[in-house]
């Protein structure tokens, strides 16, 4: 995908059949291939040095770590530019350059080796940035700052480096959980499939907030579409269905998943369903991440405490979810997870047990099967395939 193209509902529907062939649904066996991913980590415990490079054998699920791609402080979440030539990372710090803020970094990617070369690093305009994404045109990087409850946008320069922040928004409010919701805590920020709105999840104020987005300038403006979740729910991460009609929200504090019908023209959300993120799982469970699978037919969510990946079937008409499977992640505290570009494997980062495991993905049923393969990485938090 180039910097000037975007993924639309028409693209998704018209290429679904081709995508299924690429996922191996046709029954043909693809030749063994090796793909690589970048691993974001926490370095504050002294065990990790920054961003690591992982290679995956897409025939067996075997993995290997190829050293440190870039030394960086607490690069906890990563995003890839649509052109595949630049990687962005938030540095989840509360102090940077002598000021009460974290940072966001840009790295040029060497085409052949995947080596990272620092381009620049800027203040994130808030403490402890925990999420970074890139809009569909590749012109704007978006950051959510957890501790400060701010979101910010940064223009992307010609070489992929970041320009000074274009828009900064301070969230306000609090929730009923005195320990976790004493103030705003922005946890996720993405653009919608048409690139017309920015959607942000704020764990501290129990809100999913919608902003009008100017893709040419990176400016955001309030449209008044704040959707309040159940008090104490703590919305954490967001995922759109590729067809653009549904938004999925995973709530960290009450361990639920919420399905919203999405009107892209108005940036409006209508709640459709609330269901358990870990059906029948541990009493103390803190969901972390969620993704729609490669075929668009299944939703996956990670559960910390329960230490599982939950799999749900998606009703194509209503977007509603039906629980199908829960599989152990083989480690402790699964944070981010990712599908490899072929769609054959899902990799999950177990933060507290310093491990990444791979799972085979059945493209027909959506079910996961452990590959038996595991690799050790200190405090892995994010997996981003190139």
Explain the meaning of each model-derived region:
Residues 2-20:
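N-terminal secretory signal peptides and thylakoid transit peptides that target proteins
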Residues 72-83, 125-136, 172-195, 229-246, ...:
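Beta-rich, blade/repeat-based domains predominating
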Residues 43-46, 93-97, 148-149, 205-206, ...:
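Short glycine/acidic-enriched loop and turn motifs that connect beta-strands
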Residues 24-42:
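C-terminal segment of N-terminal export signals and the immediately downstream linker at the start
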Residues 55-60, 108-114, 155-162, 212-219, ...:
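Short loop/turn segments immediately following beta-strands, especially the blade-tip
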Residues 64-69, 118-122, 175-179, 223-228, ...:
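A short beta-strand motif characteristic of beta-propeller blades
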């Amino acid at each position: 995908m180039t910097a000037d193209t975007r993924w639309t509902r028409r693209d998704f529907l018209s290429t679904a059949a081709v995508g299924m062939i690429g996922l191996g649904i046709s029954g043909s066996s693809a030749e063994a291939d090796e793909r690589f991913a970048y691993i974001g980590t926490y370095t504050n415990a002294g065990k990790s040095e920054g961003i690591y490079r992982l290679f995956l054998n897409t025939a067996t699920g075997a993995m290997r770590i190829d050293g440190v791609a870039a030394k960086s402080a607490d690069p906890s979440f990563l995003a890839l530019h649509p052109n595949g030539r630049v990687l962005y990372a938030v540095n989840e710090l509360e102090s940077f350059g002598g000021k009460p803020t974290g940072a966001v970094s840009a790295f040029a990617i060497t085409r052949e080796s995947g080596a990272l070369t620092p381009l620049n690093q800027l203040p994130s305009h808030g403490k402890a940035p925990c999420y970074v994404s890139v809009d569909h045109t590749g012109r704007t990087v978006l950051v959510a700052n957890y501790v400060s409850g701010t979101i910010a946008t940064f223009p992307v320069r010609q070489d992929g480096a970041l320009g000074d922040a274009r828009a900064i928004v301070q969230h306000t409010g609090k929730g009923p959980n005195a320990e976790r919701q004493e103030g705003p805590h922005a946890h996720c920020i993405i653009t919608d499939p048409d690139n017309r709105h920015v959607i942000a999840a704020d764990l501290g104020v129990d809100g999913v907030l919608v902003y009008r987005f100017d893709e040419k300038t990176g400016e955001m403006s309030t449209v008044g579409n704040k959707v309040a979740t159940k008090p104490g729910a703590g919305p954490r991460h967001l995922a759109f269905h590729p067809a653009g009609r549904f938004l999925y929200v995973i709530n960290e504090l009450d361990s639920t998943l919420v399905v919203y019908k999405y009107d892209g023209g108005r940036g409006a959300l209508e709640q459709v369903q609330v269901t358990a993120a870990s059906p029948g799982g541990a009493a103390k469970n803190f969901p972390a991440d969620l993704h729609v699978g490669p075929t668009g037919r299944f939703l996956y969510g990670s559960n910390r405490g329960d230490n599982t990946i939950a799999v749900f079937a998606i009703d194509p008409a209503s977007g509603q979810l039906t629980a199908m499977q829960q599989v152990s992640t083989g480690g402790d505290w699964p944070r981010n997870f990712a599908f490899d570009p072929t769609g054959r494997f899902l990799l999950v980062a177990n933060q507290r047990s310093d491990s990444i495991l791979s799972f085979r993905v059945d493209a027909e049923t959506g079910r996961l099967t452990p590959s038996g393969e595991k690799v050790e990485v200190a405090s892995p938090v994010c997996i981003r395939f190139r």
